[in-house]
Amino acid sequence: MKILTPATSANLGPGFDSLGLSLKLYNEVTITKQNFTSVCISGEGSDKIGLKKNNTFVNIFNETMLYLTGKTPNFRFNFINNIPFSRGLGSSSSVIVGAIASAYHMAGFKVDRALVLNQALKYESHPDNISPAVWGGFTSNIVHKGTVYTQKADISSDLRAVVVIPDKPTSTKQSRGKLPKTYPMADVISNVSHAAFLTACFIKQDYENLRLASIDKMHEIRRMHGLKELFRVREIAYLSGALMSNLSGSGSSFLNLAHKDRAQTLRDILQLEFPEFKVEIYELDNNGFILQS
């Protein structure tokens, strides 16, 4: 079997730990039965010997298989990693979701997406990345009494994500450490209102209001100071037709949404201005993970 699990972009400005969307950029894992366990990696992480000896996907897959069947059979895992590591594009969520969903499939169980999502919460306590990897599209999420609840909206095929990917990785843990423990009431109210408005914009596909809706007062500026070029990325993106321009997850990547007829121009302008960074265009994914027998 093969599973494709998409990259995700979380927070989307004011939706800290609660909003996210899914990109057509996939990690692929092919799993076949054999007499011993083996791991083959190409793409991201292929030069890291430790990923073969202590592989998070394999570990979570085996934990899930043991839970479901009481056994951990041997398999060959062939990874094609396309999602950059530590760039705020949900590489870890892709691993977690992919491992759990594929274990259910290989164990002969029906793959229930809501169940996969809630199993994933054991490994990733914030649903803004794992939810779009499961459901696709734009997702608004809450966790209530240990259970994730999601509302999903499909994203128009007219939109493209123009993603600036710096050469500098970001640690989510370190990035969170830059944030204060308390916030002024006015900033909290601003984020709540903007997150609600942003959600309505995606549901109604009112993309012309995304720039206003995606204003954040709680985390982006503090995180962006770690890579000050990102302030210029946003400035240029808006001058060049972006509908919204926000830090992707905790960074270091920057997500810019644009109409597809503006995406290539926006990409070229950003690449010219930031030759040291990668700038890629992705379609938006509305399906979440894909299982292929």
Curated annotation (Swiss-Prot):
Domain of life: Bacteria
Enzyme class: transferase
Pathway the protein acts in: Amino-acid biosynthesis; L-threonine biosynthesis; L-threonine from L-aspartate: step 4/5
Any Gene Ontology CC annotation: cytoplasm
Residue sites binding ATP per the record: P84, F85, S86, R87, G88, L89, G90, S91, S92, S93, S94
Principal cellular location given in the protein's record: cytoplasm
Gene3D superfamilies noted in UniProt: 3.30.230.10, GHMP kinase, C-terminal domain
Subcellular location: Cytoplasm
EC number: 2.7.1.39
Record keywords, A-Z: Amino-acid biosynthesis, ATP-binding, Cytoplasm, Kinase, Nucleotide-binding, Threonine biosynthesis, Transferase
Function: Catalyzes the ATP-dependent phosphorylation of L-homoserine to L-homoserine phosphate.
HAMAP family per record: Homoser_kinase
Cross-referenced PANTHER family: HOMOSERINE KINASE, HOMOSERINE/4-DIPHOSPHOCYTIDYL-2-C-METHYL-D-ERYTHRITOL KINASE
NCBIfam families found in the cross-reference section: thrB
Protein name: Homoserine kinase
Upper classification of the organism: Bacteria, Pseudomonadati, Campylobacterota, Epsilonproteobacteria, Campylobacterales
